A protein has these predicted regions:
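Active-site-adjacent structural elements that line small-molecule/cofactor binding pockets in enzymes
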Residues: 1-294
Length: 294
């Protein structure tokens, strides 16, 4: 099983500490988000220098606030330090963030993704970008030696987003998406689109909250509180509705070790290629159990 760990440290030193801990435990990858704290690409550049083996990823960096050329420069700089271990996860974020907090327009998100990738992907592959879109333009190359191409995952959940991702990036990174939805929607949609475009089979990286515990009811109550907001964001709400569940706590993998193990196995059986655990409670027991699966 390809299992990684996600955390959201508030200092660069803690990011290094977490990455070392997870790497020493045998986990294959370490993932951080870009929300309202550290600049994740900067933090992971330090992590890449200090922790030499574990693969690194962002889950995810919002696209709208950064021109694709600037994001490409950051990602390839990180990749130069990481020596090929870095995966760039990007996402559109949400209307309430992009419009309400940044004052930018969130209209036509599928167009935005297509135009963004049209500039970003050549630059990440060491090529020049030469593109004019309706809202984004890019005519430049980057001079960053000793930086291998950067695999790019998109937080694509809807059908149109999955189709664009399959044709232009290396895969999708999901959140709040259970095994039923991965098996019936995410995997078949992105795999079909990639095959039709003559692209390699895409990566499907599934992230979910995880807690190994003897008190499932209490752990689910904690999950319901900690992850409440995701049930109100339209893109995640659509996936929860597809799954046939009420809220985020219902897709969390919670229970004793055998129950959580079975839940992870179901994720892979549904078509995911990688699983990223988000331990949120009873972390020591959860990490110990997850390490036992490696």
């Amino acid at each position: 099983m390809e299992i990684g760990i996600f955390s959201q440290p508030d200092t660069v030193d803690k990011a290094v500490e977490h990455a070392k801990l997870f790497s020493d435990a045998g986990f294959g990858s370490y993932w951080m988000p870009q929300i309202f704290g550290l600049d994740t690409l900067t933090a992971l550049t330090v992590v890449a220098r200090e922790v030499p083996k574990v693969r690194l990823g962002t889950a995810v960096v919002p696209t709208y606030p950064r021109h694709p050329a600037m994001l490409a420069a950051q990602a390839r700089t990180l990749q130069q330090v990481a020596d090929g271990r870095f995966t760039l996860g990007i996402g559109l974020s949400h209307q309430m963030v992009i419009e309400g907090m940044f004052g930018m327009t969130f209209e036509k998100p599928v167009r935005h993704l297509r135009e963004y990738l049209s500039i970003l992907m050549p630059l990440l592959n060491g090529e020049a970008a030469d593109f004019d879109g309706e809202t984004l333009h890019g005519h430049l190359g980057l001079e960053i030696p000793d930086s291998t191409p950067v695999d790019t995952l998109v937080a694509a959940l809807g059908t149109q987003m999955l189709n664009v991702t399959a044709r232009m990036a290396q895969g999708t990174a999901t959140w709040m998406t259970g095994p039923t939805t991965i098996g019936s929607h995410i995997a078949p949609t992105i795999n079909k689109a990639a095959a039709e475009a003559g692209r390699p089979a895409p990566r499907i990286v599934c992230a979910l909250p995880v807690c190994v515990t003897d008190d499932e009811a209490a752990a689910r109550a904690t999950a319901a509180e900690q992850f409440l907001v995701y049930g109100f964001l339209p893109s995640y709400r659509a996936m929860l509705d597809r799954e046939g569940v009420e809220g985020p706590a219902d897709v969390a993998l919670v229970g004793d070790a055998a129950t959580v193990r079975a839940g992870i196995e179901k994720i892979f059986e549904s078509g995911a290629t990688e699983f990223v655990a988000v331990p949120y409670d009873n972390r020591d027991a959860t990490l110990e159990m997850l390490a036992g699966l490696l």
